[in-house]
Amino acid sequence: MKFSSVKVFLSLVFVCLFTFNLNGERGKSKRGKIKVACIGDSITFGARLEDPSADSYPAQLQKLLGKKYEVKNFGVGGCTLIRKGRPTVWNELSKIMEMNPDVVVISLGTNDTCGMGTCGNRKCWEYKDELESDYRDLVDTLQSLPSKPLIHICAPSPMVLETPGLDSARVEGLTVRKPRLQEIISIVKNLVQEKKVEFIDLNTPMDHKPELFTEKDGVHPNKEGYRAIAELVYQEISK
């Protein structure tokens, strides 16, 4: 009698363990890779690189994070945060939402400093009073995704006036735009607190480091600069 009871007990334990293991494996396959969406402008895309698909910051971030992650580059040259910009991140939102990412990294604002006599005929800074509300709406939209992603908002990488080869017109334009970028960073920091999202500072660690930027440009990083961005983002995501 006792022997039969032991057999029944052991059988039940085996079934429970088997079921637990099976469910665990199913959960793992359903979850799959951790999806990371990198949202931004030409700096996210990898402008000035010979091969953005290999050396952009999202591509280098993929290498740092490894096979458990799937990093997708949603960078668009000239992209703005404000809705009235052309092009604007709002036109890309459907693609981002279709991915339903687990992690979102947003680095926008550089092109929003254009306007009022800088960057040719572009009009962005004329709408600076709409920046905060548009950014808030963007975060709200992403937070509403089914995946409930962990959102990281970046202080955009700096404009480095010490970069070799800048002509006088470029220096003049960047001198006007650089303080505007700091205003945007202040908005970013306020939103981080308000929305309880994560903050990544790409500005302070890279400022006054011309060796990280493309010559005659001063805004777009070189290969080493994109590597620096990837490492800064990696440090935050992997915490």
Regions found by a protein language model. Name each.
Residues K72-F74, H152, E198-I200:
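General small-molecule cofactor/ligand-binding pocket signal
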Residues M1-I39, I43-D55, A59-E70, E98-N100, ...:
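N-terminal secretory targeting modules
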